[in-house]
């Protein structure tokens, strides 16, 4: 029906051969709106008793463009579909189920522009079934060359979502690249493994995702490899695997001999050396190195000097550290170490005052969804708080918190903290209830508290 109407509206000079007619038919097929979508639009126009002029007025689409759409001389863009849907008073996405076919041309190959736009919109808005159907159709492509292009389209959308700050929406698309790309040594696959790790790094899936990233580092472009080294290093810091922190700090330093990445490599190197028993002098020298990179690193260096002094047993600097830190926005970074130092010194009243004074900072750490530094600092604080409760003779609450911190540490792969919790529990085991003993045994046997 649509083809006949289109042919009638077109004048031909001279005699039209079948070859010319077939050529015209193929051209029209490229732009022809699929029947189901066309009928849905017509249905709502009839319900509102609209003609094309009224649809143009209500949707904001120029009348000439409406005419080309209805005469199948122009494909329907997603932007125009949204405008038409809105003019009908429908919620966005109401007609998306009919748009899937518009993402493919007459040869049933994915149209680059429309498929990318539709895939992005569906992924961003959470239309899982729709984008799953689109991806499945794109992966059914028999031509290896075109299928490779389709995977590039999917990867492009994943990167746009990731760069737009909604990496969790991009995760299923990166999984598609990992599972479907035939070239296992391609940059797309390597980048997808890294993006997956970055997205899930704060969950119990992070450790598993990391193991795959380590095998893909050689296939990443330098810019992505720099980022990967940094986040791998940060993840090992979060899990307190200090030798691995040193390992990737050195790799990052070699790849980036100046600038921000260089500064971060030195910073993490200094933090790790403080934990593995290197000399205080060496750690302070490293801090001096990155203090001159920029004003930002100068501020970090000042705080890390105090932290290093405490790490090496010079606990008399704790009050000076607090005075320096208390008015800074990043107070949460040093607060757990100061609190634990007070507990170690049996300055329990000062520790209690610290909790009351900076309750808003402590609450923010606990509630933050930031999956790296604040979570790590919250874990550090909760461990110190459990020790504080035990030293304050609040054994039941203290041992409960120790078991919770041990459980969380084990789930994120922080075995160093896990062991510390179990050792602290053993120290106060005489005050444990049968429920505490049960949780302790479960953690030892299964790695889970319950």
Regions found by a protein language model. Give the residues of each.
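Recognition helix of helix-turn-helix/homeodomain-like DNA-binding domains
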Residues: 60-76, 100-104
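Solenoid-like repeat scaffolds
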Residues: 66, 102-107, 123, 137-147, ...
């Amino acid at each position: 029906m649509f083809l006949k109407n289109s042919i009638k509206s077109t004048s031909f000079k001279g005699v039209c051969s079948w070859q010319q007619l077939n050529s015209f038919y193929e051209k029209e097929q490229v732009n022809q709106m699929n029947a189901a979508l066309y009928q849905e639009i017509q249905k709502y126009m009839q319900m509102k008793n609209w003609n094309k002029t009224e649809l143009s007025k209500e949707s904001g689409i120029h009348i000439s463009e409406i005419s080309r759409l209805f005469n199948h001389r122009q494909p329907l863009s997603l932007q125009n579909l949204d405008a038409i849907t809105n003019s009908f008073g429908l919620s966005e996405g109401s007609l998306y189920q009919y748009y899937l076919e518009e993402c493919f041309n007459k040869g049933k190959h994915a149209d680059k522009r429309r498929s990318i736009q539709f895939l992005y919109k569906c992924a961003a808005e959470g239309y899982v079934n729709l984008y799953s159907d689109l991806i499945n159709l794109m992966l059914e492509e028999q031509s290896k060359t075109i299928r490779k292009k389709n995977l590039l389209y999917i990867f492009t959308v994943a990167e746009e979502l990731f760069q737009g700050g909604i990496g969790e929406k991009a995760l299923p698309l990166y999984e598609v690249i990992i599972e479907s790309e035939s070239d296992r040594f391609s940059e797309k696959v390597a980048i997808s493994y890294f993006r997956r790790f970055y997205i899930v790094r704060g969950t119990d899936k992070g450790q598993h995702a990391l193991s795959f990233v380590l095998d893909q580092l050689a296939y990443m472009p330098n810019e992505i490899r720099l980022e990967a080294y940094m986040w791998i290093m940060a993840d090992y810091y979060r899990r307190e695997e200090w030798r691995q922190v040193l390992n990737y700090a050195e790799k990052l330093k070699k790849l980036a001999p100046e600038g921000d990445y260089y500064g971060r490599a030195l910073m993490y190197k200094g933090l790790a050396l403080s934990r593995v028993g290197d000399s205080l002098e060496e750690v302070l020298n490293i801090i001096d190195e990155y203090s001159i990179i920029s004003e930002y690193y100068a501020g970090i260096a000042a705080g890390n000097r105090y932290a290093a002094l405490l790490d090496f047993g010079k606990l008399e600097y704790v009050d000076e550290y607090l005075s320096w830190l208390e008015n800074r926005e990043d107070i949460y970074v040093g607060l757990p170490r100061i609190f634990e130092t007070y507990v170690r010194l049996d300055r329990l009243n000062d520790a209690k005052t610290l909790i009351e004074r900076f309750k808003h900072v402590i609450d923010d750490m606990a509630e933050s969804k930031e999956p790296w530094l604040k979570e790590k600092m919250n874990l550090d604080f909760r461990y110190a708080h459990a020790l504080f409760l035990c030293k304050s003779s609040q054994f039941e609450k203290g041992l409960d918190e120790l078991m919770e911190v041990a459980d969380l540490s084990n789930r994120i792969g922080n075995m160093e903290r896990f062991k510390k919790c179990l050792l602290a529990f053993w120290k106060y085991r005489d005050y444990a209830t049968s429920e505490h003993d049960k949780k302790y045994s479960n953690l030892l046997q299964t790695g889970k508290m319950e």
